[in-house]
Curated annotation (Swiss-Prot):
Protein name: Putative dehydration-responsive element-binding protein 2H
Xref: CDD domains: AP2
Function noted in UniProt: Putative transcriptional activator that binds specifically to the DNA sequence 5'-[AG]CCGAC-3'.
Keyword Nucleus part of the UniProt annotation: yes
Amino acid sequence: MPRKRKSRGTRDVAEILRKWREYNEQTEADSCIDGGGSKPIRKAPPKRSRKGCMKGKGGPENGICDYTGVRQRTWGKWVAEIREPGRGAKLWLGTFSSSYEAALAYDEASKAIYGQSARLNLPLLPLCQARLLHFLMNLKFVHVRIQMQDLVLVRSD
């Protein structure tokens, strides 16, 4: 009789990420109180694989995707997953319609797990969005809404 694989629900993954986020916030707060004297023991985020994607596996764009933790299914959907430090267990982050969305999900999980030392797929994204938002607000745009790759502007008259 084949063994049934144990799966985690989305609540379990969200709970694990919440605990890592709290741990990182606490260790960063403690290091501020100590004056940075004692550093917490923390596993470094993984480096990028030199192998890259497996040739001939996944969808048509899988081989050219450079995002960490992101791969394409044979039917074209993109998935994101990250490994939990210490345990090595994969945390399923979800299925997405684009590699960009999957990379954003990976980045959020990486920030939750590794804190400030996280290696991100899109490290300049928050900085670029903040500068763009500041620039647009100075142009007297009343309403600015940024959603993934779309920007909606409504000019005041």
